[in-house]
Amino acid sequence: MEWAERIDSYVRQTGFPRSLFIGEDGRVVGTWIMGNDYRVKSAYYGGYPAGYLRRVRALFPEKRRALHLFSGKVDLGAFPGDTVDINRSLEPTYVDDAQTLERVPLETYDLVLADPPYSVEDADRYQTTMVKRNSVMRALQRLTPGAHVVWLDQVLPMYRKDAFAVDAVIGMVKSTNHRFRVVTVFRRLATSAELPAKKLAQRTDEHPLQAAFKTA
């Protein structure tokens, strides 16, 4: 599915104004203004803001196997899928460390939604250590080529540019006195070993500006 189609789906399904655009480099950029609806359906600390999952789902209407990483008490009614959390009491599909994901069959998923702790203070609220973002991205390299990772954070995680392409960067703001966050959409690339020789010679997966981002 091309990004022009994804943006059309977003506008059609959400009814929001067109706020995402395809830049000259082929990457999607834009802003989501979430408004002053402070509700988090689960009442769980750090839960997704109202309407976030609906927006993401509208961008990926064809995805059938979603995985919620750092899932907490994610609203599966808004976005069905399996869950991963290190806290067993939350009853996730997989009790696992997001930095290794050893128990998760990542190759069976075509979309991963990640919302890690943003700071040491946030991690303390969850009674966990601060996550190493580059380790999470390394574990996600086991995804099948073409799978997407939707990463909500205040930081762009380090990643390998031969493993992932940045398809979209979306600024997200709720209202005054709230943290400004960024939604980064990664696409898993095929490795050289997975590409036929002809495809390898013609490979155009990497955006021209991708070299501007650091690798893990």
PLM ranges: what are they?
Residues 1-77:
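S-adenosyl-L-methionine
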Residues 64-101:
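SAM cofactor-binding core of SAM-dependent methyltransferases
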Residues 72, 118-119, 155-159:
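Short "lid" loop at the C-terminus of a central beta-strand within the Rossmann-like core
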Residues 76-77, 122, 159-160:
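Glycine/Thr-rich phosphate-binding loops of Rossmann-like dinucleotide-binding domains
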Residues 99-113:
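A short acidic, Gly/Pro-enriched loop at the edge of an enzyme's catalytic core
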Residues 175-216:
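Core SAM-dependent methyltransferase catalytic element
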